[in-house]
Amino acid sequence: MARLMMTVGCLIFIVVLLDMMVPVSNTCPGYFGECGDGPEEGECCGMYNYCCKGRCLMLASCQKRRDAGRLLRSLKKLKLTTH
């Protein structure tokens, strides 16, 4: 039981870390102006920014993050169905 709890804890920790990581190798060459004037959705609009939802945002802000509560509930359901 303790081993299972440790494994689940490590998995949650890894998922949270992956969600919080910002890609540093994804840099954009040059500046393209405002979103909507030139770049399309997902294209560069600055040195480290991308067009997302009509605004110039960092890639980490643009990506959907997992809800930690939803993740915990799904893990609890998995635990209930495996016993």
UniProtKB/Swiss-Prot annotation:
Signal peptide, first to last residue: 1-27
PTM characteristics: Contains 4 disulfide bonds.
Protein function: Acts as a neurotoxin by inhibiting voltage-gated potassium channels (Kv).
The family this protein is said to belong to: Belongs to the conopeptide I2-like superfamily.
Keyword Signal carried by entry: yes
GO molecular function (one): toxin activity
Tissues expressed in: Expressed by the venom duct.
Comment block on domains: The cysteine framework is XI (C-C-CC-CC-C-C).
Source organism (scientific name): Iotyrris olangoensis (Sea snail)
Cell compartments where the protein resides: Secreted
Any one GO cellular component localisation term in the record: extracellular region
Keyword Transmembrane helix among record annotations: no
Name of the featured protein: Turripeptide Lol11.2
Keywords attached to this entry: Disulfide bond, Ion channel impairing toxin, Neurotoxin, Potassium channel impairing toxin, Secreted, Signal, Toxin, Voltage-gated potassium channel impairing toxin
